[in-house]
C-alpha cells in the first residue's frame, strides 16, 4: 500500500514530511485552493513522486509546470475528458522527444534538459458521496494509470469528510485506485479493514485531517498513521 500526502505548500513542512518517506507528495496548482502552491519545491528523495494537482487547466500550462517542477505524476481533479487526457499525454510525449533531441545537440551535460526515466503518471479523480455509477469510468480505462476516489463536496478536494466506502464494493475494474477523502488517524482500523478486501487499492491519499492549518501537516500524526497502517502491512 502506497501513501500520498497532498496539499503541500511550505518549504520547511515539505522537507519534514519528505523525511517520513511517503510515496507521493501532492502540490496543488489551482488558484482557488487554500493550498495553492507557488514557489520552489525543495530537494528530496527521488523515490518520492512529485504530483501536480490540476483542475480544468490549459494543457500548455500543465506541460510547463511538469517541466518546471519535474513532476512525476499529474492528478486531474476537474471535468477533464478522455480527449483532454489523450491530448495531454500526446503533448507530454512530444515534449519528452524534443528534449531528448535537444540534449543530443548540447555538449555540456550541465546545460542539458532534465528527462525523467519514466512516463508521467496520470491520475483521474472522481467524487463519490452515497452512490456512484462506475460505468462513467469505462472510457478512461485506456488513458489513465490510476483513478482517485474522493468525497464529493463543495471544494475540489480537502473537504475533510469521508464518503461511504461500501460503494466501492461494486467497483468492477482492475485499474488500481487511490482512496481519498477525509482520512485521519481515527480511521486506522477502518482503513486496515478495507485494505484486506479484494479491491485494487493502490494508495491512501491524506490531506486536511493531518493539518494544523491549510498546507501545514502535523508530522507526528502522519508518522503515527504511516506506522499504524502502511508499515503494519509488511509485518
Residue map of PLM features:
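Conserved N-terminal beta1-alpha1 strand-loop-helix module at the mouth
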Residues: 1-89, 116-173, 178-233
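Intrinsic disorder/low-complexity segments
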Residues: 90-119, 233-235
